[in-house]
Amino acid sequence: MDHDASSTARLFLAAVPDADTALRIYRLAAALKRAHKFDGKIIEPDRLHISLFFLGGSPNPIARMACEAAAEVRAPSFEVLFDRTVSFRGRPGNRPFVLLGDKGLDRLRSLRRTLGVAMARKGFRCLAKKDFTPHVTLLYAERNVEEYPIEPICWTVNEFVLHVRLARWPLRA
């Protein structure tokens, strides 16, 4: 585990794209924002991620428990692929516009289940039972659009992180 910061506001565990892929996603989001005439602010490349678990604005003991659970996880690296965009339902005027896909996402779901079991052993409750639709949020907009195919974007998930890189754990079998 590698610690990079100390803030615990809005903690979550996530898979993140590499820097080149994040920049590609950001550029795609900018083009789609123009094409769909969205008004929202695009998520910056260093904040793009696939959320695995949201932990809330947690105090340090919760962060420590999450770190202990994450350190127990063993899983090989895998590829994810996103090939379409869509708007999710959200609060009026604040609808998430996201990347969706299928390829590799079963392995991501498996990683999430494994992490959920480890977190349950540390005292977290019911995390793995919640619905999970793997996605990358590009921006939040006032209106929504239907599903739209895109040139596939893929990357190899080599690690998962706590909040925007508070801590990280490499994937290894």
Short names for language-model regions:
Residues 1-173:
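Histidine-dependent nucleotide/RNA phosphoesterase domain, centered on the 2H-phosphoesterase fold
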